[in-house]
UniProtKB/Swiss-Prot annotation:
Its main location: cytoplasm. The keyword Zinc-finger does not apply. It comes from Shewanella amazonensis (strain ATCC BAA-1098 / SB2B). One of its GO terms (biological process) is tRNA threonylcarbamoyladenosine modification. The keyword tRNA processing applies. This is Threonylcarbamoyl-AMP synthase. It is an enzyme of class 2 (transferase).
Amino acid sequence: MLQVTPSQISGIIESGGVVAYPTEAVYGLGCDPDNDTAIQKLLAVKQRPWEKGLILIASSFDQLKPYIDLSRVTEAQLQAAFDKWPGPFTFVIPAKADVSPMLRGCFDTIAVRVSAHQDVRAMCYACQKPLVSTSANLAGEQPALTLAEVQTQLGDKIDAVVLGALGQSCQPSTIIDIQTGHIFRQG
């Protein structure tokens, strides 16, 4: 399995690759959110149905703007997200109409997070866009916590793994509906 630094992944992502990388709590799997073929590959690797949707991670809110429908979100709702970001909080926000169903799943919303993890931020900065993010594991299995676990579960099905350390969190991100405040998952 190819091992790269966060700044080296842009070419892999641009060519439709799927990479594993460290996040705040577990290893994640990512790809280009604007490439449906790459998203389909990621879903096949993970054995995850597209209908569930995926998360976008970013180094800044500006990277997320092309994917979210700001006309359906109030300033107060946005401020609630800004108060938590960067950090382990994912917000479910109305998606723009042209966002691929491969990202949204069967919803008109998209889950987004501005990460505080140094390597995630460096990857998004290098790619100049957010990345698709889901835990690095086969559906129904425990998320990978080590490079060895990534190798065991995903092996040669992915294009590269980003070298780096997991963050200090023991929990996945909290997922919150930005419009209602409903917590889908407590982190």
